[in-house]
Amino acid sequence: MFIAQNWVTGLLGHSNPGWSVTSEELDAGYVRVGFETEGYAAIPATTGPLVLGVVESIEELTEFKKPIRHCFVNVGQANGTGENQSIICGARNFAEGDTVVVALPGAVLPGDFAIGARETYGRMSAGMICSAAELGLADKQNSGIITLPAESGQPGDDARAVLGLDDTVFEVNVTPDRGYALSARGLTRELASAFNLTYTDVAEDTRVAGIELTAPEPAGELIDIDVREETNTVRFGLRKVSGIDPNAESPFWLQRELMLCRQRPVNAATDVTNYVMMLLGAPMHAFDATKITGGLTVRNAQPGEKFETLDHVIRDLSGEDVVICDETGIQSMAGVMGGVTSEISNETTEVYFESAIWDPKTVARTSRRHKLSSEASRRFERGVDPAIVEVALDMACSLLVEIAGGTIDAGRTLIGEVPTMPSITMPVSRPSELAGVEYSPETVVARLEEVGCTVSVNGDVLTVVPPTWRSDLTMAADLVEEVLRLEGLEAIPTIVPTAPAGRGLSDAQKRRRAIGHALAYAGYAEIIPSPFMNPETFDVWGLDADDERRNTVTVLNPLEADSNVLSTTLLPSMLDAVRRNVTRGTGDFSLFGVQQVSFERGNGVSPMPSVKQRPSAEVVAELLDTLPEQPLHAATVGTGNIEFEGPWGSGRAYTYADAIESARIVARAAGIELELANADELPWHPGRCAALLVDGHVVGHAGELHPQVLERAGLPARTCAMEINIDALPLRENLPAPVLSAFPALHQDIALVVDETVPAEQVRAVVEEGAGELVETVELFDVYRSEQLGEGKKSLAFSLLFRAPDRTLTDEEANVARLAAAELAKERLGAEMRG
């Protein structure tokens, strides 16, 4: 949240006359009570003559492409002559008689923008009539000439004090559990504790903010309002102001506070709602009352209903969205944004102010579903003080009448009561026990009362009722945190805990780390696969309806609407990474990822036990039964070349054999031997897919992806991938160390001709078995096909490494073993030895 230093210090100064603080001290104060500040910055300085001026006359210059105005401005004696200053200006939001801010020649505005006198548009322009953006008070979209009340000062007076340019803007990081602090009211309460100041709640005494409430006491209902129970609306209030000046602009002091809070001034009614929100933390909405027909209904939207929000986007509504309707249709998306049909305009003379307390979960889901985060939704998601509704309505009405005239209707519609806050019991010694610091009972009670709690003392036990704006205080631990936070976390001693026995990585963690290291050493780059996916991916792949991978867990509030299920496979995320890299010009790479996947178990709906007591064994069992199965998977994907062309020779493309080898890398790191078998498993190519087996059980697949899948997904041809279930591999607690021999090895090759349908891995396994105990490794190094071999035949060449642990082998011994391997291959596979 952005907020100006002078605003919070001014609110605190009302009850603490003479108190002042530097920006550095204020920053430390925020941190002291647990708020991080992203930073703070002074309003950029303007040097030289910056004065008040009164526009005496305006000459419209119409001979140019855009409308230009030649103004004569009374700046008193600030220009040294007392004559009216000639200034060219293109802005249209000021008139003769207005008090404006003038930068005279010699002034330098933020951004080193020097002001001088020069001829332009055929006239002499000696100065600039300034906008808020040009003085560093706002961004460009908030730009507009600053107009001030006539009583702001005399022509020629220095404008800096009037504008409050000696100010600093803080960006305070408010955590999700402390929504009350998204307001000047909440932050000043915290700062009062940080600096031991007297605090007066602006909601109880609005004069702290210089605002007099002029709204009459409510007398009767304003209009009929039907709030449906299914919307979970806590409170809903409405008041009306009639007969306002539609062209009235918000005073500069109000616009200034909004601009420094990064809010854009729009019109008087809207500015008032935004100011009340920033001051009290109560989001409001203003309707053009003449555009509301009949009463209002707060209901859930019908699925498929459409609604155009104030940002001129037509939105398809869900049955979970809460809307405010009149007899003609939807007028607002509750807690998020209003609609164009009842928008405040420059013709609005009657205004309905709405202040409500919406269900935080509903607002959060609506905001995410429509990707529409607003200042209002941010506050409702975190919780808004339900007791603030009446004050917010009266303040908004009073401010609007002060700015734009009109009268406040005596009627007020108010639905819902302020909820009773549940009490919390806590031993007064509990903060001391947890922190290891002695806090007196008086200190504990005082700190809780500073927060706004009502505290009753009964011996050594406190009964605490949290204030309505602190819905995050639900248990004793929350109260302990408040005491520790306000007393200072730096007072808690730092003690290194004694490490428990058996520390270190578990065997499963060691295996996961070993697999990651092995794949990285093999040249694969690691990515972190997304835990979410689009279920339509399975349709692109052509999976059967009963495929296990379609057994997904649906996410109720997904970060992205189309990625609304938990991933049952890592490949969608891996292939998305391939697509992104290829579209950005990178075509040769191989990636790996290790991540849990999730399969739905039971009906996928878990109970919601109370947090006030430990759940029973039955509830715990029910919770565990509904948790998804989350096995750990590893996946690799490769495209383009794995070996690059250069002076050393031609390159080599990443093939299905490399994908299979990546599976072997995983297995070796886990101390497991894989078996391979032909497989027909989408999204892989049926003729280039291998099933990965351990003890006869399929644990994964590897190979080249199906050409149609690649085409539909916009991926390069011949892209290959592997995915394996790591948790399905037997866990080897102690991997055997390799046996090293001091004796030399013998290398021999063997080439076998087999049918095209016989897998190379099957041949390799038979050769290894037939070669006996003397063979250390059997590796395929060549696959050959030709007319001489015959149709449907292929030649597989293997390199055999022989070694004996206790002697030097002879060539004859190695040759006997090689021939034995060939004989077994002939017997089992019909293989014929070549050459």
UniProtKB/Swiss-Prot annotation:
Residues where Mg(2+) binds: D472, D478, E481, E482
Record-listed E.C. numbers: 6.1.1.20
Catalytic activity: tRNA(Phe) + L-phenylalanine + ATP = L-phenylalanyl-tRNA(Phe) + AMP + diphosphate + H(+)
UniProt record, GO biological process: phenylalanyl-tRNA aminoacylation
Span of domain B5: 419-494
EC top class, as a word: ligase
Stated name of the protein: Phenylalanine--tRNA ligase beta subunit
Cofactor-binding details, from the entry: Binds 2 magnesium ions per tetramer.
Compartments reported by the entry: Cytoplasm
Location of the tRNA-binding domain: 44-160
Source organism of the structure: Corynebacterium efficiens (strain DSM 44549 / YS-314 / AJ 12310 / JCM 11189 / NBRC 100395)
Family, as annotated: Belongs to the phenylalanyl-tRNA synthetase beta subunit family. Type 1 subfamily.
GO molecular function, one term: ATP binding
Pfam families: B3_4 (PF03483), B5 (PF03484), FDX-ACB (PF03147), tRNA_bind (PF01588), tRNA_synthFbeta (PF17759)
Xref: InterPro entries: aa-tRNA-synth_II/BPL/LPL, B3/B4_tRNA-bd, DNA-bd_dom_put_sf, Fdx_antiC-bd, Fdx_antiC-bd_sf, NA-bd_OB-fold, Phe-tRNA-ligase_IIc_bsu, Phe-tRNA-ligase_IIc_bsu_bact
Subunit text: Tetramer of two alpha and two beta subunits.
One GO cellular component term noted in the UniProt record for this chain: phenylalanine-tRNA ligase complex
Record keywords, A-Z: Aminoacyl-tRNA synthetase, ATP-binding, Cytoplasm, Ligase, Magnesium, Metal-binding, Nucleotide-binding, Protein biosynthesis, RNA-binding, tRNA-binding
Cofactor: Mg(2+)
FDX-ACB domain sequence ranges: 741-834
